[in-house]
Amino acid sequence: MVLQRIFRLSSVLRSAVSVHLKRNIGVTAVAFNKELDPVQKLFVDKIREYKSKRQASGGPVDIGPEYQQDLDRELYKLKQMYGKGEMDTFPTFKFDDPKFEVIDKPQS
């Protein structure tokens, strides 16, 4: 009885996996065989060019001095607003426990 359930479950899983793989292979084959129109090709080429420039520079691409000044100004504002601590670490908070007065309850 248990073996029948296991065989039934394995056949269901096998068929589900095969359908999923057939669907994925069919979609990717169509996507790779599709020719791009000239506008799409230019767009994709520019994105690849930008990616290679960004990886080479290690940061933003084609920035001028005004961008760096704006970045420094915004970082300065953040430091003024949230303290002069390290901006890369999460701040530590210190909360004091409230002081409670003990009030004697009158006996009646």
Curated annotation (Swiss-Prot):
Q: Which InterPro entries match?
A: ATP_synth_f6_mt, ATP_synth_f6_sf_mt
Origin species, per record, is Mus musculus (Mouse)
Keywords in UniProt for this one?
Acetylation, CF(0), Hydrogen ion transport, Ion transport, Membrane, Mitochondrion, Mitochondrion inner membrane, Phosphoprotein, Transit peptide, Transport
Entries under Pfam families matching the protein: ATP-synt_F6
A single GO cellular-component term on record: proton-transporting ATP synthase complex
Gene expressing this chain:
Atp5pf
Organelle targeting sequence = 1-32
Q: What is this protein called?
A: ATP synthase peripheral stalk subunit F6, mitochondrial
- Identify the domain of life: Eukaryota
Provide the positions where the record notes the PTM N6-acetyllysine.
41, 46, 79, 84, 94, 99, 105
Protein task: Subunit F6, of the mitochondrial membrane ATP synthase complex (F(1)F(0) ATP synthase or Complex V) that produces ATP from ADP in the presence of a proton gradient across the membrane which is generated by electron transport complexes of the respiratory chain. ATP synthase complex consist of a soluble F(1) head domain - the catalytic core - and a membrane F(1) domain - the membrane proton channel. These two domains are linked by a central stalk rotating inside the F(1) region and a stationary peripheral stalk.
Q: Which residues carry this modification: Phosphoserine?
A: 108
Record PTM N6-succinyllysine, positions in chain: 84, 94, 99
Q: What broad class describes the main subcellular location of this protein?
A: mitochondrion
Any idea where this protein resides? Mitochondrion; Mitochondrion inner membrane
Q: Which GO terms describe its molecular function?
A: proton-transporting ATP synthase activity, rotational mechanism
Report the family membership. Answer: Belongs to the eukaryotic ATPase subunit F6 family.
Subunit notes for this chain? Component of the ATP synthase complex composed at least of ATP5F1A/subunit alpha, ATP5F1B/subunit beta, ATP5MC1/subunit c (homooctomer), MT-ATP6/subunit a, MT-ATP8/subunit 8, ATP5ME/subunit e, ATP5MF/subunit f, ATP5MG/subunit g, ATP5MK/subunit k, ATP5MJ/subunit j, ATP5F1C/subunit gamma, ATP5F1D/subunit delta, ATP5F1E/subunit epsilon, ATP5PF/subunit F6, ATP5PB/subunit b, ATP5PD/subunit d, ATP5PO/subunit OSCP.
Its Gene Ontology biological processes? proton motive force-driven mitochondrial ATP synthesis
